UniProtKB/Swiss-Prot annotation:
Its EC number is 4.2.1.11. Pathway: Carbohydrate degradation; glycolysis; pyruvate from D-glyceraldehyde 3-phosphate: step 4/5. Substrate binds at H161, E170, E297, D324, S376, H377, R378, S379, K400. The gene is ENO1. It comes from the Eukaryota. It comes from Candida albicans (strain SC5314 / ATCC MYA-2876) (Yeast). This is Enolase 1. One of its GO terms (molecular function) is protein-glutamine gamma-glutamyltransferase activity. Keywords: Cytoplasm, Glycolysis, Lyase, Magnesium, Metal-binding. One of its GO terms (cellular component) is phosphopyruvate hydratase complex. The lineage of its organism: Eukaryota, Fungi, Dikarya, Ascomycota, Saccharomycotina.
Amino acid sequence: MSYATKIHARYVYDSRGNPTVEVDFTTDKGLFRSIVPSGASTGVHEALELRDGDKSKWLGKGVLKAVANVNDIIAPALIKAKIDVVDQAKIDEFLLSLDGTPNKSKLGANAILGVSLAAANAAAAAQGIPLYKHIANISNAKKGKFVLPVPFQNVLNGGSHAGGALAFQEFMIAPTGVSTFSEALRIGSEVYHNLKSLTKKKYGQSAGNVGDEGGVAPDIKTPKEALDLIMDAIDKAGYKGKVGIAMDVASSEFYKDGKYDLDFKNPESDPSKWLSGPQLADLYEQLISEYPIVSIEDPFAEDDWDAWVHFFERVGDKIQIVGDDLTVTNPTRIKTAIEKKAANALLLKVNQIGTLTESIQAANDSYAAGWGVMVSHRSGETEDTFIADLSVGLRSGQIKTGAPARSERLAKLNQILRIEEELGSEAIYAGKDFQKASQL
């Protein structure tokens, strides 16, 4: 048995320059570390990220309370409990009972998750296996060759992530028409470089500047204009037919009075031009018919269930419809979405739920309903690569971790490259089967 002999938390900085929680978990095998990511938008149905709220330091975003909760409450209790690190479910159950609230608001999801993920790193080492193999074991993933995910790369930003009038938040490229992860990543990189030079040529030098997740953010007005630019980049790179396009609309951001305002960044926006759910669905259908769109995330607002259901009936057999704000990795919300037939894929963000065990449960519940699972980074990321191993261990077949730019994004993609090299012929690339990867 291997158990915690020392647990120590500190604050470090994320890719936005905000403090976040880092946990060192020590066992007889050494020291194992995890850093917690943070999202820009934090939904009402998410586990609570504990921030200090002291405006005189870090603009209120300090995490000293969460760090103290690890050092003063979790560490002594977990060390005393002497739980075998290999038993992730037992460790996470212990952390949940220590907190005792439904949304982890007592200790903070950022405190709990840091310990949960660091413990998983320790467990892999205790067994002398890579992290992704440990995750595959505890999630009861299908045996056989490991599946490497399609990298959904956010190459063009709009919405709340960017200036300009474009309402949709993310436009991603997904190199599905190739046979290896490394080839997919190379194609992604080449398309991205072509996109950057086209963007600068068309919109001026500063349009090549990158956003929080590495994508360009030119002053684009409409989704069509964005998609045309990406298609030009794919063509120019020479990969037409090999690269699909995905969008994260993040439509909750522009949902007002039951309508969708595609001009939401304009304070003088004309309410007579706002779209109803069915009208927005018409726009999506038009785009799907004109472009190689394989996946749309959050096409409607998180509580506009009717619009989701109506849209799923129309295109659910053609493309992947991903719930993020809709489901927030929350088992109850996922269950409702499955029952209502509102979507067919889950966006999995470990810090929305707060422990590894609950993240695995969310993925397995989704698989059981025939859904796909896309493992996702957050906009405030770090050099931590846990989600790369998570995506491989869960057989998710798809990962969303930004553009091939900025080290905190590349860290995950580079880790999957290493895993691909290590597995050799024991790995297959999800490719066009990304939505059904758990069954491959």
